[in-house]
Amino acid sequence: MTTPRLEAPGVVLRPLEAADAEALFAAHGDATTHTYWSSPAHTSVEQTRTYIAETIAIPGALAWAITESGGEALGRIALFVQREGVGEIGIIMRPEATGRGLASKALNAVVAHAFGPLDLHRIAADIDPDNTSSISLFLRAGFQREGTLRGNWKTHIGIRDSVMMARLRD
């Protein structure tokens, strides 16, 4: 599956590439930003570069750099299509890029692509229950909270539950 360039007012999503590692280390290397990920914050740009390469290589993965005009990556959003008609979205933003509506615009653009050209019927998200900003982001994008999976992840901050959220095609 080829990751296309997506554009919406105020945001350009371009295919994620290894060269984005330095810019995205600001997100993946930040302990606060990375709190609710399954792994601890990255300790080097090289670790972020490896993570990007591994993400891009996942079968069914579409991964984008979130930008304002196609330039430097301010965040990363990925859609993983691992079975027919169903995808899962993950997103991370650099700390200085939060609060500007970029994550919301990026999420809405990927949802439109998933339900349009990709013809998915369901998109899910797996979110730590303490990650209230991410839960709010997905609620604003029309996702519904479906339930909680108790003890779903063994992470660097302990065994964590997952809030399962999803949106169905209208």
What are these regions (language model features)?
Residues 41-42, 56, 120, 148:
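Short linear sequence elements within intrinsically disordered, low-complexity coil regions
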